[in-house]
Amino acid sequence: MGENSFSRELRLLTPTHFEFVFKNATPAVSPNLTLLARHNDSPNPRLGITVAKKRVKKAHDRNRIKRIVRESFRNHQQSLPNIDIVVVGKSGLDKLSNQELFLVLSKLWKKLAKRCEKSQ
């Protein structure tokens, strides 16, 4: 597989993994998204996504958002330190176009990488 793939070892899979991040997280916040991160012991960054039905009503919008988040992460994973990241969707996220969402995520990945480098 290519180095920009999104394989199983790049995902947060269990509730325990998510709780680990939520307990002591470094945030990067925008009006529509919150990224929470915490250093991990694995050799690469890992991603978890939560987009609640309460925040984004339609399933096809939630799926579109998750696809875009995964693709953006896949493209930026080489520039991220070894951290576990949870992306939390907020209300109004479904109103963003794909391009706007990519732009917001790009800024948040950079912000998160800087904050995690400082806190290390």
From Swiss-Prot:
PROSITE patterns: RIBONUCLEASE_P (PS00648). Transmembrane segments: none annotated. GO terms for cellular component: ribonuclease P complex. One of its GO terms (biological process) is tRNA 5'-leader removal. It is an enzyme of class 3 (hydrolase). InterPro entries: Ribosomal_Su5_D2-typ_SF, Ribsml_uS5_D2-typ_fold_subgr, RNase_P, RNase_P_CS. Pfam families: Ribonuclease_P. Its EC number is 3.1.26.5. Keywords: Endonuclease, Hydrolase, Nuclease, RNA-binding, tRNA processing. The keyword Hydrolase applies. One of its GO terms (molecular function) is tRNA binding. The keyword tRNA processing applies. Consists of a catalytic RNA component (M1 or rnpB) and a protein subunit. Belongs to the RnpA family. RNaseP catalyzes the removal of the 5'-leader sequence from pre-tRNA to produce the mature 5'-terminus. It can also cleave other RNA substrates such as 4.5S RNA. The protein component plays an auxiliary but essential role in vivo by binding to the 5'-leader sequence and broadening the substrate specificity of the ribozyme. This is Ribonuclease P protein component. It comes from Pseudoalteromonas atlantica (strain T6c / ATCC BAA-1087). The lineage of its organism: Bacteria, Pseudomonadati, Pseudomonadota, Gammaproteobacteria, Alteromonadales. The gene is rnpA.
